[in-house]
Amino acid sequence: MSRIGKQPIAIPSGVDVSVANSVLKFKKGNNTKELDTKGHVDVKVENGHIVFSPKGDDRQSRAYWGTYRALANNIVTGLTSGFTRQLEINGVGYKAAAKGKILELTLGFSHLINYELPSGVEASVDKNIITIKGDDKQVVGQVAAQVRGFRPPEPYKGKGVKYVEERIIRKAGKTSKK
């Protein structure tokens, strides 16, 4: 039995939820999101909560039960408070600047990296910290992973782009012969 799937999702004020043909529609202001459950789970909106239940008793239905509940919860959280990821830049001459929808990175290459942010995602830079904000958890995480991928942290000096909460396991360098 899914421990995640059986928990109902409380619908916060200001968020409208409707179900039609196994498609959940979330609306807050002019922001609209959809989640297609493809008929794998039954979805009901009752007295301020979204309740999920498996369509059948097979393993596949029970797996989708918790997955779709988690995806719906991420949409509700994204519409109400949003998601953020923070990246830290370490290294001599490594810089970042947010210019509208473009994140400009100087990471020790011979060229500048201009990363175009997808719609619904914003980036801000404060000294060596890049903050990525958005209402879609998957997209925010994807953007953060792609920016980190330009220059992942190396284990000897710790130079590169890393998540703020990430801990780099350091290695000892070569020892010299005497």
Curated annotation (Swiss-Prot):
InterPro entries: Ribosomal_uL6-like (IPR000702), Ribosomal_uL6-like_a/b-dom_sf (IPR036789), Ribosomal_uL6_a/b-dom (IPR020040), Ribosomal_uL6_bac-type (IPR019906), Ribosomal_uL6_CS (IPR002358). GO terms for biological process: cytoplasmic translation. SUPFAM superfamilies: Ribosomal protein L6 (SSF56053). One of its GO terms (cellular component) is cytosolic large ribosomal subunit. The keyword Cell membrane does not apply. Keywords: Ribonucleoprotein, Ribosomal protein, RNA-binding, rRNA-binding. One of its GO terms (molecular function) is rRNA binding. Part of the 50S ribosomal subunit. This protein binds to the 23S rRNA, and is important in its secondary structure. It is located near the subunit interface in the base of the L7/L12 stalk, and near the tRNA binding site of the peptidyltransferase center. Belongs to the universal ribosomal protein uL6 family. This is Large ribosomal subunit protein uL6. It comes from Campylobacter curvus (strain 525.92).
